[in-house]
Curated annotation (Swiss-Prot):
Residues 69-84 have a biased composition (Pro residues). This is Translation initiation factor IF-2. Gene3D superfamilies: P-loop containing nucleotide triphosphate hydrolases (3.40.50.300), Translation factors (2.40.30.10), Translation initiation factor IF- 2, domain 3 (3.40.50.10050). InterPro entries: EF-G-like_DII, EFTu-like_2, IF2_assoc_dom_bac, IF2_II, IF2_N, P-loop_NTPase, Small_GTP-bd, T_Tr_GTP-bd_dom. Residues 509-512 are annotated as: G4. Its main location: cytoplasm. NCBIfam families: IF-2, small_GTP. Belongs to the TRAFAC class translation factor GTPase superfamily. Classic translation factor GTPase family. IF-2 subfamily. Residues 1-12, 43-60, 111-174 have a biased composition (Basic and acidic residues). The gene is infB.
Length: 902
């Protein structure tokens, strides 16, 4: 090329000093250890950074003398100096063109722009680094302050422990020993050694690299023998690795960040250990040694050790213990280890696992022994507060009495109530007998007060109904017919009233009949400890006639007087409580329960619980069939809204919300299942029960499905059928429920070949069609005694008939004849009675029965005859038996089959 500025010939020349490459690699060997005791020599090379320049080679590692300012913007390295040109000779270069000049100008402008941008980025990076370093410095100072406080606390603890040991030795006569002998003296704090990044380097020991301001202090410590030459020197007094702060380097050639010198005592380690060459130190030779993970782990363990030596405060907890709890759950509630609980049980002689269930008493002993307080709870706690809450006497008011009418069958209980209510309930009852329990309200014409009457059945099958009526009543009116006297159900009603501890008013009915004898009734009542007032007792008696409505007002007056004596009061503003008198499943209205409210007021919308059923009151219907919004104390109502029909006799209560209702019903359902399972498992317990099961294993069963209109009638039917069972045959109730006969009942009956019985209910159209299609028998009844009689007859048909033997006569064998085509024929003489052809016979030899069978041939003078009278001779042959001898006796008898009945 031609240079326009220096025209002339130019020649290329070589610089005076020849360029050369010096080896920049330092080598060394280390021994690398492997598992199982193996080791290997490894050659390690340290490659230094190549630096080009005329300055002398540095002999010490570079150390920054002070914190480096912001790094200048990087620029392109300067070209090497041009060699001296020899004027007057060489190749002539051509002049630059305009395109080349413009290209060079644009490249120069771009370079300047890049330089400005790089300088700006460097300044921003320096600012960010300064902010980060300030935050790290503040964090480091805070950590240093915490470490100083921790060291001071440890020093005080060690001093206190040392004093305690000295005092203990003095007390036990071992003599006082100086603290220096008991504990090694702590090395005096040494002056901090110069560290990389210190503000000033040791004078006279630095070597300055050209173009830099970084100094490398020369070390005064000899290198380890065998170390490679040129390796960075080791620090003379390096702090302990547990206490050495971490040094952060920003990169090769960058200045190290200054760190404050440590002010704590340093433990000088062996020079040999610090100068050892390893793979890590060889690869990171230009970095300062950092704190290792093992050092951090040792420090953490040391702090944990100090913390474990401190006495821990025992936490006392309130432990809730149910009726049964596992060991693991008990330990969790006490915040104790399960092994500690098992260890305590082992001391008591019980071996358990953490999954074993222990009772509440054992759990309470363990919790109290560990210092905790115990709160015992039970599953039945969900029923607390439902019933029998004490009312304040200032909030009570007088309520109507509840009167139960009881007595024997056909003594006129329902007729008496009809006369009081001016109604005709008897005509509506099937067969003219009461089979349901009913509740009614009557207004007394004298005082205008209401009286609640409960009518109970008088038949023997309705014992449970009478017992329920006696439990919820205040007064019992015992109806006795004047012409019939005291009967078995009358005695039962007296016992129910005594068990319920309620007063009795005797109503002697049917005094209008000519053969009525009221005095005989009073005398018979004395035999059962019922003493009327006319006989000097305290029991009120009234002679009435339901037919002619005689003395009914006097009976009401006596009831009101007895109620005043009882002083019946209750709080009507509290949540309602009552008793389910009767329950049924209505097809249109769903589950319906007849409830007698005893305390409080039952309102529409209340959430109620009765037995294992719950619900919300949708409607209240009075005894007159009217819909009401609320029912107060002593008021009988029909309640609609249950999820299912409750059982008769269940107590009803109003709860605050559905969650509480679900808790109560789930607990009661669980108890019901447990009781059923216990009754089944209890039947397999003892040896006697097993023998009885073996005895009844051959018992025949009569499968039945029973559907009734109300719960009380169903209960009476089941009780009556249960009494029909014997050791040979029994009624097996596959399903019993309240409501109409459904298609599912027919399906169940088909699977077990059972009969379906409907009491005051009918089958729907689908069920009737399915029963007709599958040949299932459905029987309908309205009177309980007709139902029981038919089932009794059907069960009697399953009984094995009785076989009765009737003796006909005896015959003695005189001689044996062999007849062709017939075999042996015995020539006999009838000694007693008669002998008939086809009758059963026994062959007796020496008073021992040797054969039982039937006569095949009976002849007299070669003629077949039907019978032979006593004193006559005949010939007899047996079926399939010919071993007859002279002198044997033939006994002839007839077997009669007699059908048995329950």
């Amino acid at each position: 090329m031609v240079d326009t500025k220096t025209p002339g010939d130019k020649k290329l020349s070589v610089p005076s000093k020849t360029l050369s490459l010096k080896p920049r690699v330092e080598t060394g060997t280390v021994r690398q250890s492997f598992s199982h005791g193996r080791s290997k020599q490894v050659v390690v090379e340290k490659r230094g950074k190549r630096r080009i320049g005329d300055g002398p080679e540095p002999h010490a590692p570079e150390v920054t003398a002070k914190p480096a300012p912001a790094a200048p913007a990087p620029s392109r390295p300067a070209p090497p100096p041009a060699p001296p040109r020899n004027a007057g000779s060489g190749v002539v270069l051509r002049t630059l063109t305009e395109d080349e000049r413009s290209a060079r100008a644009s490249a120069l402008a771009d370079a300047k722009l890049r330089e400005v941008e790089e300088r700006r980025q460097a300044e921003e990076e320096a600012q960010r680094r300064a902010v980060r370093e300030a935050a790290e410095r503040a964090e480091r100072e805070a950590a240093e302050a915490r470490r100083k406080a921790e060291d001071e606390r440890h020093r005080h603890e060690d001093e206190a422990k040392r004093k305690a040991e000295t005092e203990a030795k003095k007390r036990f006569g071992e003599g006082e020993q100086p603290a220096s002998a008991a504990r090694p003296a702590t090395a005096a704090p040494a002056a901090p050694a110069p560290r990389p990044g210190a503000p000033a380097a040791r004078p006279g020991t630095t070597t300055t690299r050209p173009g830099t301001t970084t100094a490398r202090p020369a070390t005064t410590t000899a290198q380890r023998p065998g170390a490679p030459a040129g390796r960075g020197p080791a620090v003379a007094a390096e702090p302990d690795e547990d206490e050495a702060p971490r040094q952060i380097r920003r990169g090769p050639g960058g200045a190290a960040r200054p760190a404050p010198p440590p002010k704590t005592t340093h433990k000088p380690g062996p020079q040999k250990e610090r100068g050892r060459l390893t793979v890590v130190t060889a690869l990171n030779a230009d970095e300062v040694r950092e704190r290792s993970i093992a050092s951090f782990r040792r420090r953490t363990q040391r702090l944990k050790g100090h913390a474990s030596n401190e006495p821990k405060e025992k936490l006392i907890r309130e432990v809730i213990i149910p009726e049964a709890i596992t060991i693991q759950e008990l330990a969790n509630r006490m915040a104790e280890r399960a092994v500690d609980v098992i260890r305590m049980l082992m001391k008591q002689g019980a071996m358990h696992k953490i999954t074993d269930v222990i009772d509440a008493d054992t759990a309470q002993l363990i919790a109290e022994e560990l210092g905790h307080t115990v709160k015992r709870v039970a599953a039945s706690d969900v029923e607390e507060g439902l019933f029998d809450q004490v009312d304040d006497s200032t909030d009570t008011e007088t309520r109507s009495p509840v009167v139960t009418v009881m007595g024997h069958v056909d003594h006129g209980k329902t007729s008496l109530l009809d006369a009081l209510r001016h109604a005709n309930v008897v005509s509506g009852e099937a067969g003219g007998i009461t089979q349901h329990i009913g509740a009614y309200q009557v207004v007394s014409p004298e005082s205008g007060k209401k009286i609640t009457f409960i009518d109970t059945p008088g038949h023997a099958a309705f014992t449970a109904m009478r017992a329920r009526g006696a439990k919820v009543t205040d007064i019992v009116v015992l109806v006795v017919a004047a012409d019939d006297g005291v009967m078995p159900q009358t005695v039962e009603a007296i016992n129910h009233a005594k068990a319920a501890r309620v007063p009795i008013i005797v109503a002697i009915n049917k005094i209008d009949k000519p053969d009525a004898k009221p005095e005989r009734v009073r005398t018979e009542l004395l035999q059962h400890e019922v003493q009327v007032e006319s006989f000097g007792g305290d029991v009120v008696d009234v002679e009435v006639s339901a037919k002619n409505k005689t003395n009914l007002d006097k009976l009401l007056e006596m009831i009101a007087l007895q109620a005043d004596i009882l002083d019946l009061k209750t709080n009507s503003e509290r949540p309602a409580e009552g008793t389910v008198i009767e329950a049924k499943l209505d097809r249109g209205r769903g589950p319906v329960a007849t409830v007698l409210v005893q305390r409080g007021t039952l309102r529409v919308g209340d959430i109620i619980v009765a037995g294992a059923e719950m619900g919300r009151v949708r409607a209240l219907i009075s005894d007159q069939g009217e819909t009401v919004q609320e029912a107060g104390p002593s008021v009988p109502v029909e309640v609609l809204g249950f999820n299912g029909p409750p059982e008769a006799g269940d107590r009803l209560a109003v709860v605050e919300n559905e969650a509480r209702a679900r808790q109560v019903t789930s607990y009661r359902a669980h108890q019901k299942r447990e009781n059923a399972a216990a009754s089944i498992s209890g039947m397999r317990g003892s040896l006697e029960q097993m023998m009885s099961q073996l005895k009844t294993a051959g018992r025949k069963e009569f499968p039945l499905i029973i559907k009734a209109d109300v719960q009380g009638s169903l209960e009476a039917i089941l009780g009556s059928l249960e009494k029909l069972g014997t050791d040979e045959v029994a009624a097996r109730i596959l399903h019993a429920g309240v409501g109409g006969i459904s298609e599912s009942d027919v399906t169940l009956a088909e699977g077990f070949n059972a009969a379906i019985i409907g009491f005051s209910v009918r089958a729907n159209k689908e069920a009737a069609a399915a029963a007709k299609r599958n040949g299932i028998e459905i029987r309908y009844y309205n009177i309980i005694y007709d139902l029981v009689d038919d089932v009794k007859k059907a069960m009697s048909g399953l009984l094995a008939p009785t076989l009765r033997e009737t003796m006909l006569g005896n015959a003695a064998i005189l001689e044996i004849f062999n007849i062709s085509k017939v075999g042996k024929v015995a020539g006999c003489r009838v000694t007693d009675g008669t002998v008939e052809r086809g009758a059963n016979v026994r062959l007796i030899r020496d008073n021992v029965v040797v054969h039982e069978g039937k006569l095949s041939t009976l002849k007299r003078f070669k003629d077949e005859v039907k019978e032979v009278q006593s004193g006559q001779e005949c010939g007899m042959a047996f079926e399939n038996y010919h071993d007859m001898r002279a002198g044997d006796v033939i006994e002839c008898y007839r077997v009669e089959t007699i059908q048995r009945s329950l």
